[in-house]
Amino acid sequence: MKRLVALAPLLAALPGAACAQTASETVIAKGNPILADGRFYTTDPAPLVDGDMLYILTGRDMAEPEVNDFIMPEWQLLSTRDPASRKWRHTPGFIRPENVFAWAEPARAYAGQIVKGPDGRFYFYAPVLEKNSDAKDRFAIGVAVADRPTGPWKDAHPSGPIISQKLPVANNIQNIDPTVLLDDDGRVYIYWGTFGQLRGMELERDMITPKGPEKRIEGLTGFFEAPWILKRKLVYYMLYAGNKAGPDSACTPAVYHACQAWGTATSPLGPWTYRGVALRPVSSTTSHAGAVEFKGKWYMVYHTADAVGGGHFRRSVAIDEMQWDDSVSPAAIRPVVPTRAPQPAPKPTRNIAGSASAVSSNVVPVQYWIAALNDGKVRANPLPPEMWGTWNGNNPKQPWVEYRWAKPVTVDGSRVYFFADQPAGSGIGVAPPAAWRLEYWDGAWKPVAGTSGYGTTPGAFEEVRFAPVTTRCLRMVFDASGSGPYAGVGVQEWEVLAPRPRVPAAAGVAAPACGKN
């Protein structure tokens, strides 16, 4: 990877650098994600079918492990003649913004799409940063053209982008995530947008020139970003990253995570009707997908954080079949069930928290996710949904969080990893609790006796040891920092320790409560 970065300036200086690529290689995927070994991270997939070949255009994440930023210098290409064969061709360094668009800055190669035009050529719609622009947000959408999906590519509109905050009409949104449909009648439509702002517009039949007018799109509940338009049986479908969050949301409990939602329309520019969720949140906070029919089957491509060394800014593309329910009208997208390559057997551990169900006294604020408590991960630079917390502006004085097991367990220790953004004693933000304790259920809630002490230092595990107790429910009870108002409590990970290591059991259905809470 470092070698590729070092070569990039040399490649950019070569004549015809728009077609300079790192050598392709054949990859045999073991399952999802397609590239799983951590050498290359692929993101924001956009599928394309041409003849007997399925292509997937992807971005490339190159952030260091603890960097929370989208470091994306180039696009890559995956291709296969049969997804079931798991044989893929991978081309890194496929396109760089500055090598195709003279008006673009390097880096920020965000989600684009390649579409075959009526003239048989291929059009690449790319969001890039426009240099020398005084727009408040310099993201703009350019169009490149090639005779083949593999390039070489040249700017189809060398004078600059076709969409920005200044043209074809002024807007104040971030102009990224383009998706394009060539309709059966030869008319062309483009959608784009993020941060809850979706726009749509007709293009001229040259695939390049805006025809307009630009239209603000409503009706797609929870739209956040990443639109993907397709047509099936005279119905227009829109996939998109939705983040209508809440404890009872069909999409996501945490606002930082997104689902793949979908809606339908009977005309290419709407009106649109929300229909449901096609893919629940995956391991990455962002959700970006595309869907296409290939050799009689429909596939959804999306990204996750499941590759070796992966994360929210080191994502990797996956592919699964997408099926339809034609018994209803309009036909419904059945929820896609994500698959993953076989994983190594878990190693024995004393920590049995992963097999418990977690509940808390408070309605978990949408920036947090209670599932993070026992996901087995501690991060140096966590995002809010990678922890459980109580902060909501009106924080409880004595909150608790509880693990429930389906059957009684014997435990003799616990470790908790506190998060804080305020010092101890503070009554604002998230601060270490003034005190906390463990209680277990034995016909009633009882304090765990003989504990070794309850530390409250954030940013490291605080361990508590005690004589073994057997129970089905264990809880942490906190005295929040402050004297009113109170600070929130934040926990990144809570482990519960059995006396001896054992292979951890997988979490099943939610375990029932112990008595009355």
Placement of each model-derived feature along the sequence:
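Aromatic, loop-rich ligand-recognition surfaces of beta-strand-rich domains
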Residues: P382-A449, P458-N517
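Beta-rich carbohydrate-recognition and catalytic domains
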Residues: Q21-A109, V115-I176, L181-F224, K231-Y236, ...
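Sequence contexts marking disulfide-bonded cysteines in secreted/extracellular proteins
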Residues: A18, A250-T252, P512-G515
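Short proline/glycine- and polar residue-rich coil/turn motifs
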Residues: R280-P281, G453-P458
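Bacterial N-terminal signal peptides
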Residues: A6-G16
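Predominantly extracellular/luminal regions of secreted and cell-surface proteins
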Residues: I190, F195-E204, P344-P382
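Positively charged n-region of N-terminal signal peptides that target proteins for export
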Residues: M1-L4
